[in-house]
């Protein structure tokens, strides 16, 4: 039960981040899928043309980091959805609904909870105070160098963990869907990722994410429509027929079958809720619009698209119970689903649309990976070039050309690192990295951004000590927990008994920031508190905020 519980949680631990959890363990390679490969080549061709087009329009630092602030709220909402909806969500949640029914809906709603937090607490102030990265906001009235160093470290750790999970997941997913070799798949994803970001910057990344979101929503909508058509558009029929054919019977309509440990569940819930508001590649998207109003619209549209997508995955999961489960064509000799339960949605695509639509859905799953890794790579590169190189090493005196050069070098380095780690971690269950990435985002990035915008008494000392404590607590508790301490390191019992650290590491971060700020009586601390009023005015009004013209 414990292993199953972990595998389910890890499967879903991140929508935006990881096909890895959707495809953990051994992969059964499928036959070469010609339709899928043709459609994927068409997608790559189209996106490479977009990259060429974007490269002609990417001239300045602002163009490269934020597409010059010229993306509209609607476009950005679609791009955020494209950045957030992963193959893990599409395959993983529909697979969870296929195996466990109603519990799948609970998990998918969990992913949505973080967006109202971003809408009401983060989006407008972030856009008014920042320019290229969230470190601009965190360091607005505090000491630039230490805060930017901490923010960049938090960003890079999250990006690195996500990238490893993405690359391993990408290799396994492509091996599973296309029949391609794992190493070939990882290298292919790495090369395409570098090309998008290196030449097209944020503009190319945005349009890759928009196209991917449209394709994924269109494909999932068609699948859900065909499922509903098969039951005459009657939900009662869908559910009652599913109950009849599912091995678990009526229990698939009840919640609570997956979570045996409430502390781990609460910790995961907190990480999902608040970690979303600390993901660097998501936060960076708010600087691509012209003002706070468009930033707010972005979240509104993104929430709508993401919510709609999770409703579709629920219908797709029940459709798979009905149309895939009883069909022997999709089973092996032992009666198990071909390719594993994570293939439920892919088999449903075959059942409702034939081999052509199966090829389309397989290609969309690959496109999903490319869109997510491109956003991650750009976020990592900007943390190095803008926060570490320009602001810390050069103390704000770097010229634009050098900063862009550093950013592009970082993109290439990240590409090599991602490919290398993807190959290195091929046989590992890398699901714990995803939980750790979200926990770090919730324990380090989110507290600093949130408190810097809302609490007048915050000082550099408090932010630094509390932020580092949150980050280190999350990492240490994860190492001492059951996944690493027992499963990987081979000890008999875990020192920290729960799966996720966010419940405790967030408390450590917030208490640390509060305590070390209120006990800071230095002159610098007093000055930082006095600068809050000017920050508050700008965060509310946008007066003095960087406009697209200044990018």
UniProtKB/Swiss-Prot annotation:
Membrane topology, as annotated: Multi-pass membrane protein
Gene Ontology MF terms: acetate transmembrane transporter activity; glycolate transmembrane transporter activity; symporter activity
Principal subcellular localisation of the protein: membrane
Subcellular location: Cell inner membrane
Pfam families according to UniProt: SSF
Alphabetized UniProt keyword annotations: Cell inner membrane, Cell membrane, Ion transport, Membrane, Sodium, Sodium transport, Symport, Transmembrane, Transmembrane helix, Transport
Source taxon at top rank: Bacteria
Gene Ontology BP annotations: plasma membrane acetate transport; sodium ion transport
A single Gene Ontology CC term: plasma membrane
TM spans (from-to): 34-54, 77-97, 104-124, 150-170, 184-204, 207-227, 263-283, 304-324, 356-376, 406-426, 430-450, 469-489, 498-518
CDD domains: SLC5sbd_u4
Functional description taken from the UniProt entry: Transports acetate.
PANTHER family linked to this entry: CATION_ACETATE SYMPORTER ACTP, SODIUM/PROLINE SYMPORTER-RELATED
Family: Belongs to the sodium:solute symporter (SSF) (TC 2.A.21) family.
Protein name: Cation/acetate symporter ActP
This protein's encoding gene: actP
